[in-house]
Structures are given as C-alpha cells and as structure tokens.
C-alpha cells in the first residue's frame, strides 16, 4: 500500500479515531463521523493517518501493530502511537531535529523532508502537510516533557 501524506491536524483525534475503529470493528465511515462530529471527508483524513501509521489496514481491519498495542499495552495506547510516529522514517527526522534544535524554525526543514519522500504535490500542500507533522511533533515533545 502506498502511504498517503497525512492530512489530519489533531494528533489527539487521530488516537481517538484509532481507538474507536479498533473497539468497533464493524464501524462505518458514518459511525466515526457521528462519534467525532466530523464530515465524511474529515473521517477519511483521520482514517488515512491511522493507515499511514500502520494502525489500521486499508479495509479498517486491525493491523498486527494495533493488536499488539491493545493486547500488550492497553493503558499505553497514546504512548505507543507516539512511539510509532517518532520511529517513522519521515516524521522521525523532523522530530529528531526538533529535539536537537528546540528553538529552531522547523517548518522549512519539514517541507524539504516531505518533498523528498512524497514528490509531486504543490507547494501549498507541502506547507500544510509539513505543518501538521510539526504540530504532531510539538504535541509529542510536550507530552514527553509532562511525563518527565
């Protein structure tokens, strides 16, 4: 499966959608839309983020990673999803730079990384998607700092 560049901007909602789909294996796009108060288009953004992270399959069935998370670490769903993001080839590079250079500007670097791995999009798309990744990484960094 070719990975789709993420469009979901709220990482907490990605985790929530993943948990909902996992706990409701027969759910439909409309079920998720009703649960989250989303349009069907927004559901697709968040489901695609879950697919990108290998949390659900194309048909929304459970992946081996999802089963492992809920079987072995059910109290640590967020931590495991965050770990998956950090280990991602694209997002991990951006996360590492943000850790190493906390006061730096990260969006231009993120755009360059995203362009390298996902050629063929417009500059506006690169800027939006890279901004989402930077937001996700900031969220994870804040979470790590709070956990100590």
PLM regions: where:
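Donor-sugar nucleotide-binding helix/loop cap in glycosyltransferases
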Residues: 1-148
């Amino acid at each position: 499966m070719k990975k789709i560049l993420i469009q979901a901007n709220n990482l907490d909602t990605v985790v929530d959608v993943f948990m909902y789909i996992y706990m409701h294996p027969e759910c439909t796009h409309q079920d998720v839309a009703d649960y989250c108060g989303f349009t069907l288009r927004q559901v697709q953004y968040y489901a695609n983020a879950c697919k990108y992270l290998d949390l659900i399959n194309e048909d929304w069935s459970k992946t081996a990673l999802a089963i492992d998370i809920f079987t072995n670490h059910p109290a640590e769903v967020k931590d495991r999803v965050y770990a998956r993001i950090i280990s991602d080839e694209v997002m991990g590079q951006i996360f590492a730079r943000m850790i190493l250079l906390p006061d730096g500007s990260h969006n231009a670097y993120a755009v360059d990384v995203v362009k390298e791995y996902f050629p063929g999009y417009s500059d506006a798309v690169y800027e939006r998607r890279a901004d989402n990744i930077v937001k996700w990484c900031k969220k994870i960094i804040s979470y790590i700092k709070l956990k100590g």
